[in-house]
Amino acid sequence: MTDKLHGKNLRIWIFALLGGIVFAAFDRCGYMIQHYGTLWAISENPLHKTIFHRILIRVPLFTAGVLISFLLLNWLRGRSTDSGAGLPKRGSQGSTAPQTAMAKSLALYSAAQNIPAFIKYWILYFISFLPAFLGGYPGLFAADAPNQIGWTFSGWLTAHHPLLHTGILCGIFSMTRALGWSDNTAAALCNVLQMIILAGIFAWISCFLKKKQAPQWLWIGTVLFFCLFPFHGMMAVYTTKDTVFSGVLVLCLLQVICMCSTPEEYFKGWRHTIFAGITFSLLLLLRNNGFHTMLACVPFLLIYLWKYRKKLLVLALGLVLVYGVYNGPFLNVIGAESGNAREMYNIVIQTLSRTYVAGGDIRPEEMDVIRPVMDEETMALYTPNLSDPVKNQFHTDAFEEEKAEFLKTWFQVGCRNKKIYIDAFLNTTLGFWYPDVEDEYLEFVCFDIQKDDPHYPHVQMEPKSEWLNRYYTAIGTDASFRQIPIVRELLSMGLYFWLLVLASLYLIYQKEYRKLLWILPLWMYLGTSLLGPAALLRYGYPLMAACPILLFTMWKKEA
């Protein structure tokens, strides 16, 4: 380690410096966007005059941080793990303990040993979700769930939200209403089902780490992380598609790791390929960008796994087929309306709107093209961190008629207003990549909208424990943790993006290039999320759920 610190290992210094520049840029750009709304503010202090001066000053600090992280990871890799440490021995007996107590203890231990590890983890994680469930009974009935149910029961079936998730919600509410039960009971059943699914996925992750002989510190840390990290319990009882989607995305990640690390075993027969197809299909059925996430990985997997290209192509074509059938014949059969294409153009919407509001250079002939799609009154609704106010007034039909001309105009305006476009993108995506965002939160509430409409669900929060309710409200709605340094960062989705960046840098430093494929789905998902309407914590939750896998990827030496 001393030799490395004195520069004999030039490679580690190069990558530490590279990482220092990257993280310093994230940190200072985030600070400027958070406090000033723009990167281009000029300071009277010569040390902070421009964004480039600010980044340069922070580079040494972050270079040291990356260097220490790399050295720590190298040390952890070099340690020999004692997988049996801390576990009871079957044959051991305490000479001082009473025989009856010892017999009972051994009997309990023997009974526990006979329970499959997966079931034990599953039960443990389910129990760990109960505090959030009891503190916010019947759960966080918020986000899109009220509209998903209200729209469907009103006769408007739309693929704007995933129909699989909408179908489950509506099925449970239909059943409970038919039985004369309350909407609170229906919401509770939805959340218990979600708790069971997420606990099972967490159990799968824990068993994967044990099977891959992860070090004891990692699998114990994983158990503690899944049980104690408050957002896991809150997301488990949050009736949003993002909860199960996040878990399924991590399962897809595990499939990619297995097919890349042991391809001979993985592609022997069709069992694993079929399971991967089911998992990938669930991903696209739970979120529209799930399809783009996995499809974007296929070319890279084909290059590395060319020997197994036939099965990979079958898998990819199957995914395309499921997506095509779902968005075509299936929607027609059930009479569902397709999702609005404007969801794909959030960056276009935000950049043009900010340019207009900021008084940027938009020429009259360009406004003639823009106005039928977004008029001046619409663009004046611009909100830096959320595209919905403008997007909801975006005229998709007019856009589709002149799509090429509109996008050409957008590009031309951007060429003259580069700084405004950059500011618009960074403001909308800030929460994804900056750990110190002040307004990041996960509301611990129930939404009861359209109170006079019988088609809509009417769910009221009835906490079974007031102190648990106060705790989770402080963590979520009030975001009180934002006042506590370090804790603030640990509970920020931006930190987990930084972990993803650190993992990528470390793998390149170690020349373990093929392992970049292991985390490729996370990068692809993040890429699609950056094009979304906002940086919400539930959108960044997949990175939090995948945290143990990122640590495993960095720890695991390439064979």
Spell out what each predicted region is.
Residues V192-Q213:
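Transmembrane-helix motifs of polytopic, lipid-linked glycan transferases
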Residues H53, A188-L189, N427-W518, L522:
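Membrane-interface anchor segments at the N-terminal boundary of transmembrane helices
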Residues M1-F23, T50-F129, M554-A559:
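Start-transfer (signal-anchor) and selected internal transmembrane alpha helices
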Residues G335-S465:
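Membrane-proximal stem/loop segments at transmembrane-domain junctions that anchor or position
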Residues H272-R287, V298-P299, G318-Y323:
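Membrane-interface alpha helices of multi-pass inner-membrane proteins
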Residues M234-F245, L286:
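Short acidic/glycine- and proline-prone juxtamembrane loop motifs at membrane-interface regions
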Residues V244-E264, F280, C297-V298, A546-L550:
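Specific aromatic-rich, kink-prone transmembrane helix
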Residues G136-Q148, W156-I172, T176, G180-W181, ...:
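Extracytoplasmic catalytic/substrate-binding loops of multi-pass membrane glycan-assembly enzymes
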